[in-house]
């Protein structure tokens, strides 16, 4: 397709502003590793919250949502909507603990909580496991989406897309560090929101669609609009709702939705002014991420079922797209080619914004692990601040090149999502309990990481999967994930009680620094100390329940409003307001003062 001059002006202007921000903050960011990775720990809640939202926009997210909606309907999004429980657990229980820990990365936590050689090994291994392996997988999926957008909208080859995107993003990331990422995220948030909303409004009202009512009553769409799965279809109900709600949210490690907090979300919490700002940032993120942001993508996905009802129709419209990249996730990019001049430039700028924001975050996050938790711990403990920053910049380049190579081999966003989800299945409960139960040790985590990875790979091998899972096998396909969780959990519990506990002095030091409280520490600090310190978790759980009601009601209220059912939308909005009122009534009980 041809891009008009106005669109190019919008895109180039945006890129120029972005690179200018990186250039302005580059001198300050290069002073030391704390500035480069955490911006001096002085960020306000609203800026960090917006950064969290912008970071998770990502070019692959609308593609993933489109893939889900076209295959499983709107209700299929429960596979990630359920992570709201994980997010709110981080908000009301873990955000202040992370900020009080005062670590540079969440991986540094390991040598604070555990002791001896196992702790040192776990810190170094986890740094490479998450910062390199998982990080490259995630970035590969993001770059895959960029390749598909480049092929459909700009007529670029995969190598051209990766080359152009890589030069701009890596240049920005190595210059500005974390501060550059966060400052640019503030701009990216508004550009990306405007682009996604504008695209959804225009595309739904195209003559081919005929408006929202014509869309939701179209034969290709009518059975896809429900926000809940069909309760009469047992298999669909179990797969789309029961397993995510009963098992997935607490058991799986997924970037941006880590049980107990972690990754680039933890990086932003650690950069906050104090624990109150850390909590405010994560609450704002969860409201925006789940209640409002998905709907523009969902509407475009539904509209794509009218214009491109199947993969064959996409292939017919875009014959230049390579066959190995064809899939339902391509429908989002295909729909964007229908946009008019001006709006197309804004949307392309928003997609570039999403790509740069997410990749920059992943690069800075991964580099922080490599520098703080591997290089300075395992290779060069006496490294100067300048050396740390230089290694961080070199790591940024290498991580991107590895993810770019992977992107050229990938084909589908949903397949990668499912694989990453299963690869970390069963480890989540450890990340939740390790703050509150003294008996968990380094071997608990080591065993869980290895068993989860090995079992998930085995279960995805055809020779094993065909025997255990499927219509004619021992168990239905949807039992694959719960079985990985069950096996992993049993193994790490056995290992925990079969290995000695951590050194008591280390446990006492950890408790005094973070003060998690609760009965799980009674054997270490004594009953009197537990009573004296108090325990905010019960109040936190109440806050979680109220916030769940508020955000899910806002999510559904927005959907019903779009569908034209104003009565149900109004009722849900009223319930959300009541939940919000009681949530802020108990605000002081969890010692949170954001404003």
Predicted regions and their residues:
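Membrane-embedded helix-loop-helix hairpins and adjacent transmembrane boundary segments
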Residues: 1-595
């Amino acid at each position: 397709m041809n891009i008009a001059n106005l669109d190019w002006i919008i895109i180039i202007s945006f890129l120029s502003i972005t690179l200018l921000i990186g250039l302005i903050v580059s001198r300050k960011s290069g002073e030391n590793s704390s500035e480069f990775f955490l911006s001096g720990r002085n960020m306000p809640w609203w800026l960090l919250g917006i950064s969290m939202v912008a970071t998770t926009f990502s070019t692959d997210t609308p593609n993933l949502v489109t893939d889900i909606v076209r295959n499983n309907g709107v209700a299929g999004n429960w596979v990630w909507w359920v992570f709201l429980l994980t997010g709110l657990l981080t908000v009301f229980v873990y955000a202040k603990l992370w900020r009080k820990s005062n670590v540079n990365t969440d991986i540094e936590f390991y040598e604070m909580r555990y002791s001896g050689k196992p702790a040192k090994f776990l810190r170094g291994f986890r740094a490479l496991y998450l910062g390199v392996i998982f990080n490259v997988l995630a970035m590969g999926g993001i770059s895959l989406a960029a390749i598909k957008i480049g092929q459909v909208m700009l007529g670029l080859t995969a190598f051209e897309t990766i080359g152009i995107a890589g030069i701009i993003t890596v240049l920005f990331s190595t210059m500005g560090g974390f501060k550059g990422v966060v400052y640019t995220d503030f701009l990216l948030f508004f550009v990306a929101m405007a682009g996604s909303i504008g695209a959804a409004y225009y595309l739904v009202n195209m003559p081919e669609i005929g408006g929202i009512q014509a869309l939701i009553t179209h034969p290709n769409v009518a059975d896809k609009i429900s926000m809940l799965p069909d309760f009469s279809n047992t298999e669909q109900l179990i797969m789309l709702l029961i397993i995510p709600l009963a098992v997935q949210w607490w058991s799986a490690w997924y970037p941006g939705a880590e049980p107990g907090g972690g990754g680039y979300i933890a990086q932003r919490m650690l950069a906050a002014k104090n624990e109150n700002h850390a909590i405010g940032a994560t609450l704002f993120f969860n409201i925006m991420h789940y209640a409002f942001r998905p709907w523009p993508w969902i509407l475009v996905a539904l509209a794509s079922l009218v214009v491109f009802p199947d993969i064959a129709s996409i292939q017919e419209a875009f014959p230049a797209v390579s066959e190995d990249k064809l899939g339902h996730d391509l429908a989002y990019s295909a729909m964007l080619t229908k946009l008019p001049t001006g709006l197309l430039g804004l949307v392309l700028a928003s997609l570039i914004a999403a790509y740069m924001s997410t990749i920059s975050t992943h690069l800075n996050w991964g580099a922080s692990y490599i520098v703080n938790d591997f290089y300075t711990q395992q290779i060069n403990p006496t490294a100067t601040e300048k050396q740390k920053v230089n290694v961080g910049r070199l790591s940024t380049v290498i991580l991107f090149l590895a993810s770019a190579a992977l992107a050229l081999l990938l084909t589908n966003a949903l397949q990668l999502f499912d694989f990453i989800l299963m690869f970390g299945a069963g480890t989540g409960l450890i990340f939740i309990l390790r703050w509150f139960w003294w008996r968990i040790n380094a071997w608990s985590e080591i065993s869980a990481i290895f068993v989860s990875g090995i079992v998930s790979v085995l279960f995805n091998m055809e020779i094993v999967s065909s025997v255990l899972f499927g219509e004619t096998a021992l168990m239905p396909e949807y039992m694959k994930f719960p079985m990985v969780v069950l096996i992993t959990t049993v193994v790490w519990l056995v290992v925990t009680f079969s290995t000695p506990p951590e050194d008591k002095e280390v446990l006492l030091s950890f408790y005094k620094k973070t003060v998690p409280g609760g009965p799980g520490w009674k054997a270490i600090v004594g009953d009197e100390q537990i009573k004296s310190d108090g325990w905010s978790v019960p109040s936190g759980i109440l806050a979680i329940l109220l916030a769940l009601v508020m955000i899910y009601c806002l999510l559904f209220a927005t959907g019903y409003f779009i569908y034209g059912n104003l009565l149900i939308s109004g009722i849900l909005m009223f319930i959300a307001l009541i939940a919000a009122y009681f949530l802020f009534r108990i605000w002081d009980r969890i010692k949170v003062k954001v404003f």
